Amino acid sequence: MLAGCKPYEPVPAEFDALVHRAWELWDVGSAEDMEALASAFTTVAPTHPASDGPLRGSMARLTPEQRDVVPLEPRPLADGTVGLPDPVDAAPMLVLNRFECTMAQFEPTVYHLAQDELFEFYDSYDRTYTSSLEDYLSGVNDRITWNADLEATVTLAGVYSETLSGGLRRAQTANGTLLLTRTWIPVPAVWSSENKVFDQDYQINLYMQETDDTIVHLQGVWRHLDLGALGTTESEFVVNAMMSSSIDWDRDTAKLCAEGRP
């Protein structure tokens, strides 16, 4: 293992179960389901307190049935057929972290159209809403959905472009506001260089206010990425870099909150 890498070990089962359940329920979950998710989150998160630092590790892979809760476009497969990618190839990553912000400050960063104005990770980001932002902000609907075309640069690997589908759901529960974001890539990303693959990416994020000025963030990712000589999402080096990137994202979000942006 390279210096500075942490072991990529399974997280406690209750975190694994919560992330998978949230992924499955984003679309179809009832108000009662959201209450159960929020209750589980507020019960599980304190078992890994802030004093222990971020929790990071592996979890169960998605099943074909869990993959199918989001629409993907068929594509050529390695066996010469056309179909959907096998989710067993998408490596699982889970991160629990906390950052300083209030929910009222944080939520606008999620539905902000020009994400590249907020986060330097993107070279470009063009989002189009596929449901009404006005209805979401007024409370008529509890969710908003979007598609985005984006470009980003991976150091030493090159530039990739992708289409990202996603959405934000807000649930008012007895334990407070629960925000759920879910994103995925319906088609493989396109690279500027050869011998790179990024064809599966499924993400679910849960956010709740833990203290007056702290948000607790639980992220689950299932991703298939092959960077050639740099490694794949089956290597600890690549996976650790990605989990560190999630923690950096929270740090940058806290900075936005401190600056009163967006």
Task: Give the predicted meaning of each segment.
Residues 2-4:
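C-terminal motif of bacterial Sec signal peptides marking the signal peptidase cleavage site
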